[in-house]
């Protein structure tokens, strides 16, 4: 598999997960076959303000390649600057944009899954980050804000136009948060 110019030797990729994908967990997953690792979500504002605790989230294990760093935020200028800072600090191979976090403290600031309600803004963010870094940019988002607004296809098209190299779609909406999914196939007519 390839994302932009980054070759990934395994079909297994480690998803970014807040509070889970720290450096030790990423190393274990890499040793067990993950071909791509990713940090947990990192605040673009905290990177722009040079918060020391936030920089600890960027720690990598020796030889962690290919690796992605995931940032979140809703200001295109800050997101572009944060992407540059993250790449300069880590040498990561990919910048991943979190546009799917459903947690209140994130969406209440207009970040994460809140961007599902404003695809044009998401596109401006993606475009700014793509212009700011020389590595591929990817994005993770959800099926939609709620079941009445499942706009993931249109959202992906906006991001593609902005220059994003790949997307990952979380199968739940923001309203479903992390609830159990029960999908049934359509009944025959």
Regions found by a protein language model. Name each.
Residues 84-95, 104, 108-109, 121-176:
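Alpha/beta enzyme core
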Residues 14, 29, 69, 97, ...:
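Conserved, mostly hydrophobic/aromatic
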Residues 183-189:
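Conserved small/polar residues in nucleotide/adenosyl-binding loops
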């Amino acid at each position: 598999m390839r994302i932009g110019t980054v070759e990934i030797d395994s079909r297994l990729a480690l998803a970014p997960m807040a509070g889970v994908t720290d450096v030790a967990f990423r190393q274990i997953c890499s040793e067990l076959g993950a071909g791509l690792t990713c940090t947990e979500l990192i605040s673009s504002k905290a990177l722009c303000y040079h918060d020391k605790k936030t920089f600890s989230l960027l720690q990598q294990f020796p030889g962690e390649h290919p690796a992605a760093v995931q940032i979140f935020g809703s200001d295109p200028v800050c997101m572009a600057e944060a992407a540059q800072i993250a790449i300069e600090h880590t040498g990561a191979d990919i910048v991943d944009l979190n546009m799917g976090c459903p947690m209140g403290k994130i969406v209440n600031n207009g970040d994460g899954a809140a961007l599902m309600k404003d695809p044009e803004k998401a596109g401006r963010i993606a475009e700014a980050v793509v212009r700011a870094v020389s590595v591929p940019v990817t994005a993770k988002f959800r099926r939609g804000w709620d079941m009445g607004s499942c706009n993931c296809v249109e959202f992906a098209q906006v991001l593609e136009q902005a220059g994003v190299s790949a997307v990952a779609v979380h199968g739940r909406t923001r309203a479903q948060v992390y609830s159990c999914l029960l999908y049934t196939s359509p009944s025959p007519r």
